[in-house]
Amino acid sequence: MSALLVIFALVLMITIFNTQSAYEEKEAAINEKNQMIEEVVGVKSEIIQELIKAFKDSDLAMEVDPQTGAIRFSGGVFFESNSSEVSPTGREYLEEFIPQYINILLSDRFRDEISQIIVEGHTDTAGGYLYNLQLSQDRALSVVQQIFQPTFPNFKYRGDLKSVITANGRSFSIPILKADGSIDANKSRRVEFKFRLKDDQLLDQLQGLGEKDGN
């Protein structure tokens, strides 16, 4: 009987030890994941704060999203209705905006963190989806082309920008809504400048794992 008790006690101790070890390993993995999330979120937050500070007193008709860092210009600033040619006013806006914007994103402080700088065109819901998809794509591309025109004033990091900038058209897939839930056609016609971090995909995966851990 005493031998059985000894065996039982040993098995119980091993089980408790293994359970404790597994718990500690899981706890360490969760802590490591949370630290990585904090680091990525911290970098993004720093960039957003720098953008807000740089443009808070700007006369440009633009908005900085405090959550994502996306910078939104009304479409009327750059383009006439149904046109993808950058207007003279739009060029003036770009000449003032781009050097400041790129000087932040591609500075020594943040350059290694940036995966993409995205110029994104959006339209209102007038007309068909495909027509507006083409129009929004053409507008985004026109903005990028304008930035690299030989007549556009030179700015710091212009050469580096070529490797990370992209132009996307979204048609009317992401409209801006009024308080009553209806579409604000004027605000929906817009151009947005966004940035994506190299660790954004990792952040999405880590946050997804966090949701699973919480279930």
Where are these regions (language model features)?
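Charged/polar helix/coil "stalk" or linker segments at domain boundaries
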Residues: 31, 42-77, 91-93
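Surface-exposed acidic, glycine-flexible loop patches that form ligand/cofactor-binding
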Residues: 61-62, 106-111, 156-158, 182-183
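Second-shell loop/turn segments in exported
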Residues: 33-40, 77-89, 128-134
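Periplasmic peptidoglycan-binding/anchoring modules of Gram-negative envelope and division proteins
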Residues: 51, 64, 79, 83-118, ...
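Short terminal targeting/anchoring segments
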Residues: 1-42
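Short N-terminal helix-initiation segments at or just after the protein's N-terminus
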Residues: 58-71, 114, 135-140, 199-201
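Soluble periplasmic/extracytoplasmic beta-strand elements of cell-envelope proteins
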Residues: 61-63, 70-78, 116-120, 166-168, ...
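Periplasmic OmpA-like peptidoglycan-binding domain that tethers envelope proteins to the cell wall
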Residues: 88, 120-203, 209
